[in-house]
């Protein structure tokens, strides 16, 4: 059984550890600036209202993740305790079989890491939007609002990209890419169910997904900065 525990642990733990490294430890230039960012400017009423909605979205996302991660564990432990109590008449979590304890430990140690990783990403994206809200022009902010209105209710305040002072910021799960939109070449996209896979070079290759309704806003940015006419 020891080898089974090790296999379970490795299968769940290693992928999470890899994502943790690329998301939390390894940072690009923008993310290093973001780590040092402290709010310095008072936002306008509209921008502050948007930021408050981002905070509310982040709070709800964290609550939902807590329920998803830990409710199954609580239910499972309750079932195991009930079964043990019916057998022995003793209500004690330590009385659960060692094999079951090891399986729970093998699964939920990686879950704890995944919990930390997702909470980090939510907090990082919230902070990034605050930083960009301070720096962007009024036209950039109006574009951000248009993108928000094109997103589903559950993702309205989690934009896949933000334009700020002639820089394009792509929000991918484990990284935020800062791109000069004038350098974008080899743009291509394909439809996959409800999303669109977008691929381009700037100069490195980047692939990410967009909701269908958001694609026109993204392509308008490309047209503006590359002087290309794009038909879609």
Language-model segments: residues:
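Conserved beta-hairpin
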Residues: 122-177
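Domain-scale macromolecular recognition modules
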Residues: 177-180, 195-197
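Eukaryotic intrinsically disordered, low-complexity regulatory linkers and tails enriched in Ser/Thr/Pro
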Residues: 1-141, 156, 230
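Acidic, Ser/Thr- and proline-rich intrinsically disordered linker/docking segments
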Residues: 127-145, 156, 185-232
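Short, flexible beta-strand-to-coil junctions
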Residues: 85, 97, 165, 172-173, ...
